[in-house]
Amino acid sequence: MPVSPLLLKFAALLSLGALTACGPQGLESPINSPYVSGAESQNVLYTAFTQRSPKFLDPAKSYSTDETPYTYNIYEPLYGYHYLKRPYVLTPRTAVAVSEPSFVDQAGNALPADALAKDIAESIYDIKLRPGILYQPHPVFARQADGRFSYWPLEDQALKDKFVIGDFKQTGTRELTAFDYVYALRRLASPRVASPIFSTLADHIVGMQAYGKRLREIDTALRKDLPPGSRDLPWLDLREAGFSGVEALDEHTLRIRVKGLYPQFKYWLAMTFVAPIPWEADRFYSQPGMAQRNLSLNYWPVGTGPYMLAESLQNRRHVLVRNPNFRGEPYPCEGEPQDRAAGLLADCGKRTPFIDKIVFNIEKESIPLQGKFMQGYYDIPQVDRGDAGVAMLVAAGDSAAKATLYAKHGIQLPTTVEAQMQYFGFNWKDPVVGMGDTPERQVRNRKLRQALSIAFNWEEYVAI
């Protein structure tokens, strides 16, 4: 099922009544409610964030857990993960299917699917997109009756009263195409973006490294006569020059060429780094004056996902609302053996999303957050962190009174498996375990590092 796990988490919580935050419909709001009268009867999920607002909502830059409730519900990568199946299973989102690569040798000759890694020069991914997927209503697509864009080009005076994306009253949409993914992958190489994964993907995608170098040269030329630190930069149009490793074969077919055999590559395609970017959005936000007003993909994303950002008050409040152009995806009908008994398949086949609006309010202190959650002002303390749930599980285990209180409030504390990776590094400049300044020391130090790695008891470390 091409459904966002986080979206389905919201859906499951709401449909199961896992956390009862709102009072029965028809009752008046309590006098100390932080919400407007009648809000408790609306189809809204209330939650909180405890640190700053998300720093990056641009999918090429976003690499932090606290940004994922926004990015994975606004943008759509090619793939996602099945909400209920464990171990995790890739599923298509905007793609028709999870595509298997074809292989060629150095001469470009086709190889069988079971070819040896040493014989494979390239892995070629041809990915078909689902037709008819539309972007959210957004000013970047707005056009006048004669077909000209409503908000490009804009004169300086046109921005004097524009501070949030809602100040642009006209909106439009268009269909998602394979070129939007091509544009997104090209942006990863742009020096204007400084994506944290460019160097990693450039090692694997054919031609990406050289393309990044060429973009740096073009960007340097565009900045030549500008003062240092200028925020208003000429648009770096990525439609004009590309690289052979990524191309659109037609409107709905994307081809990616990967060096050698790299079976893990498909998992990158489930991350928002490869979420589509319409060139219209890149051009719209590059106009003079936009950066000074924080009008950019970092603050106002443009996507095809189930939700869109309707309100954004930095370090105060963010609101996601249902994307009216979202096609709707069926809730899964299969999962783990215990899921049916737990009621997690009760909504089988129903169209998602189930929730009309998601409201994030800042709560800097944990005790007030916990208190408001227990009073019903929040459905979930934090959607991106499980700390509160872990603390409540411990409290319920230690105190029968707490367990009774949670049961009285109808609070459920389901657990799931989360994949994590931890590692320890060696100081490369250390004379004993580092690189070593002679060939002999390099060999000795490497063997010592390997011995330490073998001797380290990971099982005991995890248990502690």
Q: Where would I find each of the regions flagged by the language model?
A:
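N-terminal lobe/hinge region of extracytoplasmic solute-binding protein
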Residues: A48-I120, V302
